[in-house]
C-alpha cells in the first residue's frame, strides 16, 4: 500500500463544505467517489483544512492510501474525468508514510475577496462579499498589524469551535485593492473555525469608519467574540496555500499569479 497526496481546487458554491454528509453534496464525497471509479477501492480522504459550505479552494491538500499504482498524470487525468467541473485535481504526489495532510502542515494561507462597489456583480456574487460602502484599506492595513504574531484570538473564535486553545501565530496579513475588489491575504500556523471570516468582518468595521484602528487591539485584549464584527460571508473566502516541511516535496500554490502583490 502507498500514500498519495493530491492538490485540489474547487468552487465551494455548490457544496455543503468539505466534510462528507449523508444528505448533501460535499467535496470529500466527490473526491472519494472519483478515486473509487478509477481504483475500485473505497478510501477515506484526509484534508488540510475542512472548509465550510460556500468556501472555495485553490490550494487544498489531501491524502489517502491505495493499492493502485498509477503515474502522476494518470491520477490527475483519471480523477478529473469523474469529477464535476467545479472540482479539479491539479497535481498528485507519492508521499512517505509519515505525511498527513492536516497534521504535517506548518502553515495555512487564505485570501478573502470583497467586491467594494455600490453596484453588485452578477458574475462575482458567489465568489466575493459584495460590500457597498467605501472601505479605506489604509485604515484596515493599520488595524491588521495588531493581529500579527502570537495572540489569543478568542474574540475571533466562532461558537462551536472545538480547538483546545485560541492561541495562534499570524505570519502576515496584507490588504490590497485590485480595481473594485479588496483582497485580504492572511497566513498563520493554523486557524480556528471561521477565524478568518470573523477577522475580515471586524476589519471591515474599521475600513468603513465605524471603529478606529486600535479597536482591533482592544478586541484581542478582551477575548470576547460578542464585541467583534460580524462573520463575513463564506462566498469571499479561499484556501490558497498549505505549507509543509520541504522533505515532503509538496508543490507550492500558484496564488501569486492571481491576486497577491
From Swiss-Prot:
Keywords: Isomerase, tRNA processing. Substrate binds at residue 110. Its EC number is 5.4.99.12. GO terms for biological process: tRNA pseudouridine synthesis. Formation of pseudouridine at positions 38, 39 and 40 in the anticodon stem and loop of transfer RNAs. Homodimer. PANTHER family: PSEUDOURIDYLATE SYNTHASE, TRNA PSEUDOURIDINE SYNTHASE-LIKE 1. Belongs to the tRNA pseudouridine synthase TruA family. This is tRNA pseudouridine synthase A. It comes from Blochmanniella pennsylvanica (strain BPEN).
